[in-house]
């Protein structure tokens, strides 16, 4: 097996709050192989986006990385000074942010925003060379050269999202984190955006971490899926296993909540509400909503352990 391009070990993130500490990410561990498509799924507030920001060392006060380590190709990101970490962003690991509407600078043309990314990383190019590079990047994501001269408000939602992909991949990163890249887009545009992301990934031979809660989209795109609940990874498995034989009760509940065109019957919701991250229940955080919870689940927090080709944090897996 090839060496992981990204290695996350027991990463924890907390936020200070007047009513108590908010444990947004709790000892998350996983590895990402070169060229792999890895998904992170879970309800809103489960810690997915916070985990992505922690991997990029972009957590701002009152948040902090409490513990754990992130490595890229053997280098610990915690050991890098701010200048080297800034250089690694875009060039080594890049983020396609959630909500392109709020991610692009409204007063700068798209071409200028790409050129600024080049300049920020020390790439000095003649005007003509920069223009050719920008045109090539836009073509890579299926946008015409004229987009370089346009402002964000002149683009549709799908075009904005593809412009964000162009900016994120302008320095050919080895890892692309796509945080809900299809949110607020209709299904036709969603497909176009995901096809664009897949094409760019293949051309760059990059690995992708896709964050979202659309299990159908995950099933079509990722190779392996990590399911998060209350800041913890509760299951990691090949996507086919997640869909056909989920092992964690929360994963099973997520799959059961999906409407099906085949059965056309009633689908089951997940009872109760996700817990407050500053007031987590003892033991397994899912036990108040779990149909098979026992006394042990209320007392002991299950650890992520190997079960065949999967990893599951459940006492009964």
Functional labels for PLM-detected ranges:
Residues 151-155, 159:
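Conserved ABC ATPase signature
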Residues 2-5, 14-27, 58-64, 81-85, ...:
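A short, flexible loop at the N-terminus of ABC-type nucleotide-binding domains that lies
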């Amino acid at each position: 097996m090839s060496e992981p391009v990204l290695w996350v070990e027991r990463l924890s993130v907390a936020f200070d709050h007047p009513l108590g500490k908010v444990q947004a990410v709790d000892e998350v561990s996983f590895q990402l192989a070169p060229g792999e498509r890895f998904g992170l799924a879970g309800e809103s507030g489960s810690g997915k986006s916070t985990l992505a920001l922690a991997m990029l060392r972009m957590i701002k006060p009152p948040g902090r990385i409490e513990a754990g380590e992130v490595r890229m190709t053997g280098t610990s990101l915690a050991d890098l000074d701010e200048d080297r970490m800034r250089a690694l962003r875009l060039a080594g690991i890049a983020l396609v942010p959630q909500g392109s509407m709020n991610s692009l600078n409204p007063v700068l043309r798209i071409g200028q925003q790409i050129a600024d990314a080049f300049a920020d990383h020390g790439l000095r190019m003649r005007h003509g060379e920069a223009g050719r590079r920008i045109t090539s990047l836009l073509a890579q994501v299926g946008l015409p050269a004229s987009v370089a001269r346009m402002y964000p408000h002149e683009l549709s939602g799908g075009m904005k999202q593809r412009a964000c992909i162009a900016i994120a991949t302008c320095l050919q990163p080895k890892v692309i984190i796509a945080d809900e890249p299809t949110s607020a887009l209709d299904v036709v545009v969603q497909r176009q955006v995901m096809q664009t992301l897949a094409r760019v990934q293949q051309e760059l031979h990059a690995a992708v971490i896709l964050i979202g809660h659309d299990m159908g989209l995950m099933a079509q795109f990722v190779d392996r899926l990590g399911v998060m609940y209350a800041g913890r990874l509760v299951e990691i498995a090949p996507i086919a296993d997640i869909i056909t034989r989920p092992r964690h009760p929360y994963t099973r509940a997520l799959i059961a909540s999906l409407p099906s065109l085949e059965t056309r019957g009633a689908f089951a919701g997940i009872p109760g509400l996700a817990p407050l991250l500053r007031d987590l229940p003892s033991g397994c955080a899912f036990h108040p909503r779990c149909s098979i919870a026992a006394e042990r689940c209320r007392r002991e927090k299950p650890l992520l352990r190997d079960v065949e080709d999967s990893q599951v944090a459940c006492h009964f897996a």
